[in-house]
Amino acid sequence: MEFTPSFEQGTLIKRYKRFLTDIRLEDGSEVTIHCPNTGSMRNCLFEGKKVWFSISDNPKRKYSRTWEQAESDCGDIIGINTGRANQLAEDAIKSGVITELQDYDLLKREVKYGSENSRIDILLTDNDSHNEPKPHCYIEVKSCTLLEDGQGYFPDAVTTRGQKHLRELMEMVSMGHRAVLLFVVQHTGIESVMAAKHIDPDYAELLSQAHQAGVEILAYNTEMSPNQASLLKSCPVKL
């Protein structure tokens, strides 16, 4: 995924009111930008460190700048815009980077599914013309950015929505489909991922149940810069 134009740089002052962040531009002026991450952003807020942002030319937007990336105290790059995770996943499937998700004919986004009225992030299917078409593959994408004591964790806050998605994926497996939970690791310092039992024990328990039920758990690291981002390689998941 190429960013055109490239992201511009500033310095983090503070994040507040969930959707707003104050930064200092390179010319010394201070501005408020939109924060697209509605989570806790635990261990992602490093005041005084570099941030990168995109600029929209939409005149209807109150805040034209959107926070995209951040620098950690250790110099790692963190993808702040969780909305980019789905596109990163789609690009990686189409380019063959995610080897486990190849040889399907069609890719669809945001398809309704399940008994709890969810929308799957990515659905892979075969054409009906195949003599033996593969089972549908339902892929739920999650952005992982929490690094604590050298370990990557998900989630960074209690997520009832994430719990619902795990139940939906297990339901798809019970119906004979393929179901995948894909962690897009948007933190260059994370080398492995595990459930954050200390933050959301219910999610951790459901993740274990989902794995035992046949839901595939994958994680891929992201290579990031102000110019581009792409999934790079498989990342171990500790279950």
From Swiss-Prot:
Database matches in CDD domains: SfsA-like_bacterial
Stretches of the chain forming a coiled coil according to its record: none
Superkingdom, taxonomy of origin: Bacteria
Annotated protein name in UniProt: Sugar fermentation stimulation protein homolog
Entry-linked Pfam families: SfsA, SfsA_N
Record Gene3D superfamilies: 2.40.50.580, 3.40.1350.60
Assigned protein family: Belongs to the SfsA family.
NCBIfam families per UniProt: sfsA (TIGR00230)
InterPro entries: SfsA, SfsA_C, SfsA_N
Molecular function per GO: DNA binding
